[in-house]
């Protein structure tokens, strides 16, 4: 008959591996609020999130000491921060400005943001996005629908492999790649004109 050994009796390297296997990809909501600080006479940013603390960090001290998560998105002396594993977690920022994420810019691997493809995005916001050159995956929640993002798909220097860029229609939930959006656009306006034949050809 098999005998269950108390977890604490397993060798440390086995216990560490078990804690590592508890890692699951989470979508971590990241937003900021401003607060007036009377002591300094300044307005300070504080991170806010609806994402709960990772369950493993609430289990025991040994789990917390494994370094599976790190404190992130802390602004200056603010006591507020989030626990994140940047290798697996997806950072969801909604309409939050990319500038606020500058301290974590080189750590973030996966991001979701919500925008309209307007002039502000095309000529300003996209420049901030392009600085996040360690990204491996981007999801864009399209407030104005998928078709409106065809121009951005062509113009933006996406800082991750283009096959890892996904667009999501906010209203319908439909998902599409940039190439899918190209096809949708062609179905409406027709294919791009072919190159004209050189002079003298028949």
Identify what each model region corresponds to.
Residues 1-95, 102, 198, 202:
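Short, surface-exposed structural microsegments at secondary-structure boundaries
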Residues 9, 100-103, 127-130:
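Structural motif
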Residues 86, 106, 133:
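Structured loop/turn residues at beta-strand edges in well-structured enzyme cores
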Residues 14-15, 98, 118, 145:
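Conserved beta-strand elements of beta-rich interaction domains across eukaryotes
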Residues 87-95, 99, 110-120:
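Internal catalytic-core helix/loop-beta-alpha segment
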Residues 1, 109-202:
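Eukaryotic C-terminal
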Residues 72, 98-99, 105-109, 153:
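Surface-exposed beta-strand edges and their flanking turn/coil or helix-capping segments
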């Amino acid at each position: 008959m098999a005998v269950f050994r108390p977890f604490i009796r397993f060798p440390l390297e086995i216990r560490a591996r078990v804690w590592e296997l508890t890692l699951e990809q989470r979508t971590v909501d990241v937003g900021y609020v401003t607060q007036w600080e009377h002591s300094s006479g300044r307005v300070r940013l504080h991170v806010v999130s609806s994402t709960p603390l990772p369950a493993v960090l609430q289990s025991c001290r040994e789990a917390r000491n494994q370094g599976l998560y790190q404190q992130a998105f802390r602004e200056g002396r603010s006591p507020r921060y989030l626990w994140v594993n940047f290798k697996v977690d997806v950072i969801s920022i909604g309409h939050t400005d990319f500038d606020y994420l500058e301290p974590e810019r080189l750590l973030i691997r996966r991001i979701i943001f919500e925008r309209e493809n307007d002039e502000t995005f095309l000529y300003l916001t996209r420049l901030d996005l392009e600085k996040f050159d360690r990204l491996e995956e981007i999801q864009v929640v399209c407030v104005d629908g998928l078709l409106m993002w065809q121009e951005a798909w062509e113009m933006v220097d996406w800082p991750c492999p283009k096959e890892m860029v996904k667009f999501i229609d906010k209203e319908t939930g439909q998902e599409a790649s940039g190439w899918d959006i190209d096809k949708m656009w062609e179905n409406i306006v027709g294919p791009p004109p072919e190159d004209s034949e050189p002079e003298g050809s028949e």
